Amino acid sequence: KKIINMFEKSEPLSGYGKIILGESFIKSGNINEGTKLIKDGWVTADLSRSELKSFRKKYKKHLDSKDYIKRADYLAWENKYWDLKRMLRYLPKEYQLLYTARQLLMSKSYGVDSAISRVPKKFINDPGLNYDRLKWRRKRGRLESSLEILDNVRNTKNYMVRPDKWWIERSIIARSLIYKKKYQKAYKITSMHGLSEGPELADAEWMS
């Protein structure tokens, strides 16, 4: 009850805090509110290996496969590849294959091509996978194959999920194109940024 009163006017900002508050609600008999907070907090909570095992066991009946997938997706977009690696075993098989490929790409580990080849067809155009492939190629100086990805993805906020992340890659690649005097191509990839807010928008509008 004391914890609930502390957060009467505003919810905790951290995922971990939401889980603790959710537990308090459940103990007080408010199962629905408690479950909602635990589900929300689980996605973004900063958990050690032992905390992950403990929380997973403790809140087993409140979490389903969708919650595990949401957490894996959050960790992948935040580039938390060691945390993501710990999550892989708890995901449904097809999602294990998707996030294994993403984890290997972002951690620059061995076996990337093999992992990508095992990704189910329905995920082959997953925005996160395409983003990680783009970043992997760009970091290796593979300009043409990076452009291949940018030319074939949908340039909408809904598809990109995190257009701010995509913009960082677009801007770096655009600068390489400008250096090579490929101005028209640079304009094309910067103008299709999909941003609608944030500091990246000003940068994108200026570059395009």
Predicted regions and their residues:
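Alpha-helical solenoid repeat scaffolds
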Residues: 1-208
